[in-house]
C-alpha cells in the first residue's frame, strides 16, 4: 500500500521525494489544497470516504500516517 500512496503523492507533487521520512506538511511538501486533492484521490482510488474529522494535517504528514488513516477507513 505504501508504494501506491507514494505514487499518488508523486503524481500530485512530482517535484518532491515522498519516500523520505520527513513531515510532508512541516517541510512544505503538501499544503491544504494538496491535502484536499489527496483526500479526493485516495477516496476514488481505494473506494472509501475519508470523514471530514479525519482531515487533519497530522494524518497526512507521512506515508505511514496516510496508510494508518486508510486502514482506519477499511483499506487492507
Sequence positions of predicted segments:
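Thiotemplate assembly-line natural product biosynthesis machinery
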Residues: 1-17, 68-76
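Phosphopantetheine carrier-protein modules
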Residues: 10-29, 47-56
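Catalytic nucleophile serine of serine hydrolases
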Residues: 32
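Conserved catalytic core of two-component sensor histidine kinases
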Residues: 36
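Aromatic/hydrophobic pocket-lining residues that form π-stacking "cages" and hydrophobic walls in ligand
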Residues: 39
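C-terminal structural segments of small proteins and small subunits
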Residues: 52-75
Amino acid at each position: 500500500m505504501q508504494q501506491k500512496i507514494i505514487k499518488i503523492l508523486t503524481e500530485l507533487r512530482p517535484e518532491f521525494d515522498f519516500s523520505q521520512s520527513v513531515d510532508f506538511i512541516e517541510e512544505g511538501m503538501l499544503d491544504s489544497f494538496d491535502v484536499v486533492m489527496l483526500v479526493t484521490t485516495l477516496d476514488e482510488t481505494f473506494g472509501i470516504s475519508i470523514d471530514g474529522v479525519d482531515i487533519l494535517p497530522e494524518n497526512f504528514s507521512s506515508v505511514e500516517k496516510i496508510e494508518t488513516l486508510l486502514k482506519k477507513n477499511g483499506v487492507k
